[in-house]
Amino acid sequence: DFSEFVSARLAPLDCEALELFCIDANERIRFGKRFSAGDTQRVRVEPEEISRFLATHRPAGLVAAHNHPDSPAVPSDADDRFTAQLQMLCSLNNVRLYDHIIVGTDGTYSYFLVGRMEEIRRAFNVNNLIGGRICP
């Protein structure tokens, strides 16, 4: 399962890291990238960097995963804001955000598995904000 895969990659790290995984139309991982700032409390990735990543790799979908090296896998307010911002960036680029997984000292947290991903997808979707298609 994907949570076990990212846990094996992120749990051993001493600093917080974010990984983005490009998913193709057949729901297979095609590419992954790790972002890290060497900080135990946060990793900062600018929206422009994620936009470039999406434009370069053109995935059908995306899974985000990051770790809390010294704390439980409980999403913080900053994690919720990041997930909402990432969903909006994905929506603007016609990419489906499948999940955001947090790896902590007590296991993993999946926005998808607890049912929050669909709510975030609906709330932070460009079509919902502007009322559908843009027509001249």
Task: Please report, for each region that a protein language model flagged, where it lies by residue.
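Non-Sec secretion/translocation targeting segments of pathogen effectors
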Residues: I134-P136
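Active-site-proximal loop/helix of nucleotide/amide-processing enzymes and allied scaffolds
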Residues: D1-E4, C22, N26, S36-G131
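Long amphipathic N-terminal alpha/beta scaffold segment
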Residues: D1-F31
